[in-house]
Amino acid sequence: MGLALFKAGNVPRRLLPAAIALGTSTFTMSALPGTPAIQNAIPMPFFGTTPFAAPGLGIIAAIVMMAFGMWWLGVAQARARRAGEGFERVSHQTGDSSPLASDDLTVRELASTAREFDPAEIETGSRAAEGPPIGIAVLPLAVVVCANFVMTQYVLPSMDTAFLSLPRWGSTSLSSVGGIWSVSIALFLAILVLVALNYKRMPAIRDSVDAGANASVLPVLSVASLVGFGAVVAALPAFEMVRDWVLGIGGGPLVSLAVATNILAALTGSASGGMTIALDALGPTFMQISQETGLSPSLMHRVAVISSGTLDSLPHNGAVVTMLAVCGCTHKESYLDLVIVAVLGAMIALVTVIVLGTMFGSF
């Protein structure tokens, strides 16, 4: 779809990865309240928060990311037009490059180790002969947000969840698992709506379900392994020095949390991976600081999520490598615009949230 739109608008293909990153890896992933992205779900068990943590700050961050990204893409497009550059100027691949991406073992390895997905899944499942109307296509997305909100604000709080404190249920609480429950149920309901509205358009629904189930194995096992890795790191004697250094960073706990998450996201090349390790190792410490200082856990949740979506988009990131391969572009052609849109814009939004959160608290 992106290639068709860019070709029709005579927009350079090299800007396509940045445009995709703006829509998938910035405000929709880390800032918009209620987003079902895994990055927004990871902090919930640590801070006892919901997907709608710090909604006001999240909306402000989303506006900053989107406005800055759209501004830069507009500048880049205008500059390309003045130079006489159009869609066909990037011509080393002229067709749909997804088969090449799915067959490239290097691309598959980088994407897989980044806890994203196996690009070979692009070619699995079945495709409908024609797409649904725009209203039917958007409805499942609306169901996710609405169901998530209803579950979080009304259904789960009204339930008797005293049984969760029993050892057989892990001696947990609703605040620790409620966010995960609401996201899971919202996604399940959206899938049911999608299937019900598009059943006749699905030539082989079982093949699509099988492909989706297979694709889910990699992120599930990867996140589980990261939790174990984070626990091992936290148990090392040298970790105390790292923890003291992180907590000693000037600017308060919000800055410390942001720096720790940024560094680990950069090292792992993954937003979810970096945040999982950071919170598994330092989450209890930051939660204790929150209780002692009165700092809102919702604010820490939003700062952690936005921080994870900044330096994760370095050149070795599996999603970046896969996106460039699928779009038929190279790092030399497209990476600068992608960094400005996905990294610099997120950094500006992160600083904005930290400043506003420090001044006014969570809202």
PLM region descriptions:
Residues 3-8, 48, 89, 207-215, ...:
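Short amphipathic alpha-helical coupling elements at transmembrane boundaries
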Residues 56-204, 322, 326-327, 340, ...:
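Long, contiguous bundles of hydrophobic transmembrane helices that form the permeation core
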Residues 353-363:
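Juxtamembrane boundary at the C-terminal end of a transmembrane helix
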Residues 11-28, 54-59, 63, 253-266, ...:
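Alpha-helical transmembrane segments of multi-pass membrane proteins
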Residues 10, 212-213, 323-344:
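Interfacial loop-to-transmembrane junctions
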Residues 174-238, 263, 267:
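Core transmembrane alpha-helical segments of multi-pass membrane transporters/permeases
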Residues 1-5, 34-46, 273-288, 318-327:
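Re-entrant/interfacial helical elements at transmembrane boundaries that shape
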Residues 1-3, 220-233, 247-288, 305:
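Hydrophobic alpha-helical transmembrane segments of multi-pass integral membrane proteins
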